[in-house]
Amino acid sequence: PWILLFDPTSACNLHCKGRWAAEYGNSLNLSFEDMDCIVTECEEPGIHWYMCTGGEPTCRKEDLFKLAAKHQNSVFHLFTNGTLIDQAFCDRVKEVGNMAFFISIEGIGDATDDRRGEGVYDRVMHAMDLMRENGLLFGTSICYTSANYKAVTSDEFMDMLISHGVRFNWYFHYMPIGDGANVDLMLNAEQREYMIHRVREIRGFTGGKPIFCIDFQNDGE
């Protein structure tokens, strides 16, 4: 394998609708020693790309900064809600030099707040602007549903993200988890097909946008 994904923690400072990880509770953690052991052992056969999910990885930012500083021949990508990113955080990222980020967003304004909580969209925009101003590498993690799949692939949305410094989008389709999950938000076959063609259109050499889009499920081929 050339990439490894691990969860530093199951803890999160938000409680998003339909978040699969929420079903695991918020008390599970890997110690720094555990994470260091994982990376050390995986570097030996040549794995140098690590994705950190959760939970919210930035809840463990000090340990992750320490981990990245120790393993300078590897790269660490964090999936984050972006709400814990401030100038001090950006300064630390620049110090270690081998971290990048996928910031979660579901659309413009209320489209994000309805799932993640009031005010989260503005906090995400602030985090993006800080990261852009500090020259950091980041993209988005977008959960698309039957309600937002066209909005989060629209030209307006793409142009907005590009203006805030986003370099890539990683799309995941909605998966209903738990007793209270809304199955109506699942995409049907026609909507899935739309996403297949639209993502390829956005990243096309002709008529595309200067942003790289990946669809986790539909690009699995």
Predicted regions and their residues:
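A short, flexible beta-alpha/helix-coil linker loop
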Residues: 22-26, 108-111, 176-179
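Short glycine-enriched, charge-decorated loop/helix-capping segments at active-site entrances
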Residues: 23-28, 114-120, 184-187
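Radical SAM/AdoMet-radical enzyme domain recognition
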Residues: 32-52, 60-173
